[in-house]
Amino acid sequence: PVAAINGYHTCGSNDTLASAHPSDSRKGHDMTTSSVSPVTTELAGSETGITLVIHAGAGSRGKHSTPERIAQVELDLQRALDAGYQLLESGAPAHEAVVAAIHVMEDAPEFNAGRGAALTSDGIAQMDACLMTGDGEVGAVTGVSTVKNPIDAARAVKEQTKHVLFADPSDAEIADWGVATESNEYFITEQRRQSLAEAQSGGDEWEKHGTIGAVARDAEGNIAAGTSTGGITNQMHGRVGDSPLPGCSTFAN
């Protein structure tokens, strides 16, 4: 089985990866971080047993990083691992572990997904997410601006519709899916406002390396992968990147 999150073009040498699997030194869900390519994420874990790998994006260690921020990033990564791995230990399917881990990162303002997402040129958070399982079933959303956890909307597309990708789904569709919502202001942080102002004043306009993701293998050998992102700082409204496109940033087979 193969699962992958993010292509080479979205991973940089400062990307933060963390993995949890039975061969770790302590009880299964210890965190290890390294600067490795996405190929390594495909190979993490043992030939048998449960595995969880998460990816936080190099933006979490960008130019605004401080020792305190890096410490918070590492704490949130551990929380994400714990959330997903505990589900795998309890016998939950791989996709539930992926969603749980991504939830934690979407809720943490340090990452470019959910709360803390990069802002468009209009100053709003416009988010994308994708979830795929090893049986080929996939769901994705792009351009959501009020879904608290975009990965939930991607899961809803996968499980509740006959389609693969929804662009800017309506409020009625989101309500039918039963996913939690927030006003767009909820997603906007002061750091993201500053990043947008810098970009619009001639700074680093294309602040990249922000997609988060997770890959899991459950006790039955099933695999799943998911990604979530706020895109690129100062992107035009309506831009669609690779993150919600199956086979581009997310793949499980």
Give residue spans per PLM region.
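Short, Lys/Arg-enriched N-terminal segments with co-localized hydrophobic residues
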Residues: 1, 5-11, 16-30
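Alpha/propeptide regions of enzymes that mature by internal proteolysis
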Residues: 32-253
